[in-house]
Amino acid sequence: MKKSYSGVTRTSSGRLRRLADPTGPALKRSFEVEEIEPPNSTPPRRVQTPLLRATVASSSQKFQDLGVKNSEPAARLVDSLSQRSPKPSLRRVELAGAKAPEPMSRRTEISIDISSKQVESTASAAGPSRFGLKRAEVLGHKTPEPVPRRTEITIVKPQESVLRRVETPASKIPEGSAVPATDAAPKRVEIQVPKPAEAPNCPLPSQTLENSEAPMSQLQSRLEPRPSVAEVPYRNQEDSEVTPSCVGDMADNPRDAMLKQAPASRNEKAPMEFGYVGIDSILEQMRRKAMKQGFEFNIMVVGQSGLGKSTLINTLFKSKISRKSVQPTSEERIPKTIEIKSITHDIEEKGVRMKLTVIDTPGFGDHINNENCWQPIMKFINDQYEKYLQEEVNINRKKRIPDTRVHCCLYFIPATGHSLRPLDIEFMKRLSKVVNIVPVIAKADTLTLEERVYFKQRITADLLSNGIDVYPQKEFDEDAEDRLVNEKFREMIPFAVVGSDHEYQVNGKRILGRKTKWGTIEVENTTHCEFAYLRDLLIRTHMQNIKDITSNIHFEAYRVKRLNEGNSAMANGIEKEPEAQEM
C-alpha cells in the first residue's frame, strides 16, 4: 500500500516527488501526465512521462481552441461522481495538454484532491465545499517573451480519505468534451492564477462556477477516457506594452478599460478656467501695437553755451545724437537772435524703436542784454502746439498725427555755488506753464560736496519763493504710489550731473567718466553725481508720464485758449491771425 502525505507522493520509479504548495510562489517546470485507475484496483501507481512532449506535439493541433472552459466540466463531473460514489476515496487528477504550436508547446497539470480532513464526517453529500486553487505552470518551447504557467485545481470532497492517481494519455482527449456550466448548484470552484514575476501586476479575478448533478454513467464515460485540459491563456510581452495581460476578457473589466484610457487623458490639454475671460491679454495687444508703431520723444535743452548740453544728451542715450557747437569766428561770436535747431535720430534697442528729437537753443543768455530772451523759445513751443491743433481740426485729418510737441525741457543752471540768476528765475517761471521743466546743475564736478549741498538748498528755496512748479508736479500725482516715487525725485531737484562720452577701464569694467589727476569721475556712479537718477526719471520710469502730461495738461490748456479766442473773434466779426504769445 502506498502512503501519501500532504504535499509528497511517490512516483512509479520509487522516487518521492514533492507536490507544489497551493499557496507557494514557485512555478513547476516539469511536464507530468497521470493516469487514473478504477476505484477497486490495487494501490494507486504513478507513471512519470518526461518524454511526452514529442507525443503531445503530434496532437497539439487538436487542442488549439481549448481554453480555460475545459477545466470547468472536469471539475463539475468529478463533483457529481464524488456525491454519488459510495466509496470514500481521495482522488488526485493531473491532466495535461498543449496549446497551439505556433508560439510554444504548453502543458497544464490539474490536480484534484478529495479529502475528508476539511469537513465533518456527518456532513451531507450535497453540502457546499470550497475548491482551493494551486499554482499553474505551463512549460514548452517558446520565445523569451511568453511566460509559462501551471494550473493546479484541488477539489475537496467530504467522506473520502483514499488518494488515487489518475493518469490518462493526452491523445485520447477529443475536441468536443466541453460542457457549458450554466445551471445552479451548491458547489463553487475558485480559480486563482498568479501572474509571472516579470509580468505587470494583474491578478486574475476569482471565478465562481456552480455545477449541477450529472448521471453516474455520463460522469464515468467522460471522466475516464477524456480528461479535460486546462489551458491558461496568455499574451506575449510584446502585446502587453500598453496594458498588462491577464487571464480573462480584458474588455469586460472596467479597471482595465480605465488603464487603457489613462494614457490618452494625459495628452489632453487642461481645460481653461470657467470664469476666465481674457481681459489681461490687452496688455500684450498694446505691446505688439507699440512695437510696430514705435515711440516719439522730443526733448529741449536750454542754457548758456559751454555748459555741456550736447555732451549730456549724448551721455543720456549713449550715442552721438547732439552735435557740439562749432567755435564761431570773431564776427559771429555775438548772434543777433537765438537760433533753434532740431536734430532727429532713430534709436532701436531690443526691438523697440524710438524717434528722438533734440531741440537745441544756442545763444540763449549769451547777450549783454538778455531781456525777453525767453520769447523765441516760448514761440517755438506754441508753434508746435498750433501745428498739432490744426491737424486735429482738419476734416480729413491723418490717421496718425506727427507729434512734434516739446515733451520736456532740460534747463541748465551754471554751477556758481550761490543762487539762481534773475534770468533763470524769469525763464523757468514763464515756461513752467507750457512745458515740463527739469532743472539740472551743469558740470557739478566743479563743486565740492558741501558746495553742492548748499547750492541745491538755495535753488530749492528760490523755486518755492517764486512759485515755479517743475516736473514732477505735485498736483499731477495720481495715487499714493506715484506720490511716494515722485517725492524721492523732488528731493533731488535740481539734479547735479556730469556728462561725458569717453569710455575708460576701471577695475576691469567699461565706464563713462572724466579722468583727472586725482582720479576718475564715474558718470553713472550715484556717489559721484546724480546722472543716473536723471536718466531714470527721463527714460526708465517717467517717459510716458511726461508725454501724457504734455498732451493732457499743457496742450489741452493751449487748445482751450485758442478755441476761446476763435469764438470771440467770430462774435466780433474780426478775423486775425493767431499769435504765438505767452499763455
Curated annotation (Swiss-Prot):
Residues 293-565 form the Septin-type G domain. Filament-forming cytoskeletal GTPase. May play a role in cytokinesis (Potential). The modification N-acetylmethionine is found at M1. Residues 442-445 are annotated as: G4 motif. It holds the Pfam family Septin. Residues 1-49, 79-105, 166-252 are annotated as: Disordered. The modification Phosphotyrosine is found at Y276. The keyword DNA damage does not apply. One of its GO terms (cellular component) is perinuclear region of cytoplasm. The modification N6-acetyllysine is found at K62. This is Septin-9. Residues 1-14, 204-221 have a biased composition (Polar residues). Residues 303-310 are annotated as: G1 motif. Expressed in all tissues examined except muscle. Isoforms are differentially expressed in testes, kidney, liver, heart, spleen and brain. The modification Phosphoserine is found at S30, S82, S85, S89, S325, S330. It comes from Mus musculus (Mouse).
